[in-house]
C-alpha cells in the first residue's frame, strides 16, 4: 500500500420522547501497489425507541452521546432496528459485499447494566457466490 485516506460522516438525533436515529458512512481510498487506486465503503443506520421515554443526552463539546438513565425502578426497555452494509469490491479487488439487518430488544437495568437480544439476517456476496445467515445474539453489558 502506497497510502490510504479514510473519510467518515456520523450523525445522531435523539429526542425527549425516547426516539433516536444514528448513522455513519465511511469511505476508504487506498492506493494499492498491485491494484491501483480502490475505494471501499460502508454505512449503518440505527433507529431505537425507549418505551418508557428516556433518551441519550448529547454532549456538543465532546461530540458523544451520554448514557441512557432509566427513570423507573424496573429499568428501561428499548426496541432497536439496524441496517448495515460494507462494500469491498473495487477495481481489481473483489473483497465482497456484506449486508445485515437486525431487530432487537435491550433492557437497561441501570445506567451501567444492559441486557440485549438481537435477531439478524446477513447477506454475503463474494465472487458471485451468495450466502444468507440468520443470527441470534445476546449480550450482558457493563459500562464502567
What are these regions (language model features)?
Residues 1-144:
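Outer-membrane beta-barrel pore domains
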